[in-house]
């Protein structure tokens, strides 16, 4: 494999051999710029750097191909797709997040990608099977709609309501089942041999570490026709370290997220 040569046999992306090799790192620790109306996009508690999304899109697609985000939030995936000349469709229940995405496009002088304000379980019916070349999404967290940070009164909103009338374990089970339903339907819109990447962070809550990434990976592995291929760790250098348990107990500072990679068979 020539280090700086693009192979015509490359059916996945536009990367050279050396770029492909670098993209296989299981940890992303690149410092991404705080730009593209970051303050405005930060109204959403789970926004991702558009350049990070662009880097992932470059790994799993070629220019001009189509990307789907069934939980678009404020449009990190869509902005990333625009940066690298891909087409994208984003779906979200919350019109506020879509409005923020559109305002960012206006302020940045970028053409808007297609957005749909609806339940993904309904909106996905609009598209034929095998329409998309890549799915990139950041799933809404279980129990994160109005979660107060420890020792901090700042409240961040996610894209999914709490299951407030159920017990904690019941609500987590419902969350996992809902994620499976939506992403299972999304996968049907993905071309065979193509990939889905899912952001998911773990959580420390009520003095317990919740390995949501592992639980979600196991649940998504139940979807017929896809195979898990990797777990990429994104280390976010912008996250602050904390001393929540000091001096009595160890409590981790959550400065990473997992990116679960699946391929449609």
Language-model regions, residue ranges each:
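Class I S-adenosyl-L-methionine-dependent methyltransferase catalytic core
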Residues: 1-265
